[in-house]
A protein has these predicted regions:
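Hydrophobic, low-dielectric interface segments
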Residues: 12, 117-120, 225-245
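Short amphipathic alpha-helical surface micro-motifs
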Residues: 108-111, 178, 213, 220, ...
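Feature targets compositionally biased, intrinsically disordered low-complexity regions
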Residues: 157, 175, 209, 221-222, ...
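Long, low-complexity, polar/charged, intrinsically disordered or flexibly structured peripheral segments
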Residues: 187-232
Length: 245
């Protein structure tokens, strides 16, 4: 937890993060750096969290989700861990639950890499930060307003609406047509997560069928890596190490 200076949280989360790093063959330093970025995004002990243990548990839950998404998507956690600063920064602009937003941004990064045209984990993470910045740029905001789409939170001043809701509304309002979508998300990097969902929407024929395809795509990124799977992966790894030794 060198990035947060939160030693107590780092100590409380050490065992869980070490096990997760082993189970996903992620370098410890990358796992801890990623967890530090997630911890920064989630909040502070004494404010959002009562104890270091409570914060450490919340950080681990997010990281287990990120690991599970790595199994479903195109970017493994060992690669994405190095990019969590960008994903965490993007998550901070949206309304609602911080943990949930981190996982939504991670899912969008996975989709950007899988079928949105992002060529690497670095590009995928950059694309979600660019996506958040699109929604904060005056020229783009004017385009959304013109299309009848409100990108601002109705309940949290200064925050953006749920990112998935914004994309879905854009697809509905434009019918998924390429030109109107490009007009809204006019950023060659930031439109990559949107492109992945728009492609699924259009392939299914748009409308209700298209939205079902979008929901099915997003549903893949709803799980977590269970404690039993982490233990099993580590046991297999230890067996392999013993056999080699």
């Amino acid at each position: 937890q060198k990035l947060t200076g939160d030693l107590a949280t780092g100590k409380a989360g050490l065992e869980g993060l070490t096990a997760l790093a082993g189970a996903t063959t992620t370098k410890l330093e990358d796992m801890f750096a990623a967890a530090g970025n997630v911890g920064n995004a989630l909040g502070e002990v004494g404010a959002e969290f009562k104890t270091p243990e409570e914060k450490a548990k919340a950080v681990l839950e997010v990281m287990k989700g990120v690991a599970a998404f790595g199994q479903e998507g195109a970017v493994e956690i060992s690669d994405l861990a190095k990019q969590m600063a960008k994903v965490s920064a993007a998550a901070g602009f949206f309304e609602g639950d911080r943990s949930g937003n981190l996982l939504k941004m991670t899912a969008l990064a996975q989709l950007a890499r899988q079928s949105g045209g992002a060529a690497s984990a670095t590009q995928a993470a950059t694309s979600v930060l660019s996506f958040a910045n699109i929604l904060r740029t005056p020229a783009r905001r004017a385009q959304f307003k013109e299309a009848g789409i409100d990108v601002d939170s109705a309940t949290q001043k200064g925050q953006l609406r749920d990112p998935i809701s914004i994309i879905k509304e854009a697809l509905t309002k434009t019918g998924g047509a390429i030109e109107p979508m490009k007009k809204l998300f006019a950023n060659v990097m930031g439109d990559k997560p949107v492109t992945a969902l728009a492609t699924a929407y259009n392939k299914a024929g748009g409308g209700d069928a298209g939205m079902k395809a979008v929901d099915a795509m997003l549903a893949k990124f709803g799980g977590t890596m269970s404690d039993s799977q982490i233990a099993s992966n580590n046991a297999e790894r230890m067996k392999g190490t013993a056999a080699q030794g």
